[in-house]
Amino acid sequence: MNGLQRNIAHELGHSWFYDSVRNNEFREGWIDEGITSYLASDELLYQDLESYKTEKQYGADGSREYYTKARNEVRSKSEADFLKGLDHCYLNEPWDVVPEGSNAGSKEYSYAPIFLHHAKEIMGEEAFYGFLSEVYRTYTNKVVHSEEILKILRSHNDSKEMNDLIAFYFKEN
């Protein structure tokens, strides 16, 4: 999948997450941008600027090799290792609250897909897509918030491992 195909897939994904299931883009952009970035990516490591630079520099095959290697590194590391130096990365903070050492948009386009990837690893594929399907069915033509998504997520998997993952990525009351 090249950069243009990923962008088209991402934007089509907004037909489900943002057009049908709505959220406050400024306060909780991770919901639509993170979910569509995750779902549109065939290699987990989404369509950020680095992928375009890599593809331009190394060609599509070199880019695929680079991102396959990066994906495998992500899969072999824990959350804390991959997001080194961060004691948390709250996805449910406004767009302009950026984790130290990160760029604007990192939470929404990078960290949110990583959160979803690890949630899927914890839950298993069937339960993960069941969770996303339930979010879609429950909140079509409605506005959804992080708390509601987390409630559905926990209804599919309320393990200590999942709650530790959630604690890293979400500020809860």
Model-found features: residue ranges?
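Active-site His/Glu-centered metal-binding helix of metallohydrolases
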Residues: 8, 12-17, 35, 39
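Short pre-active-site segment immediately N-terminal to the catalytic Zn-binding motif
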Residues: 1-9, 21-29
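Short, conserved alpha-helical segments within structured domains
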Residues: 31-36, 145, 149
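C-terminal, non-catalytic "cap/extension" segments appended to globular domains
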Residues: 125-173
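Short runs of predominantly hydrophobic/aromatic residues within well-ordered alpha helices
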Residues: 9, 112, 125-128
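Acidic/His/Gly-enriched intrinsically disordered linker/tail segments
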Residues: 33, 37-114, 122, 139, ...
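A generic secondary-structure signal for well-formed alpha-helical elements
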Residues: 16-20, 25, 39-47, 51, ...
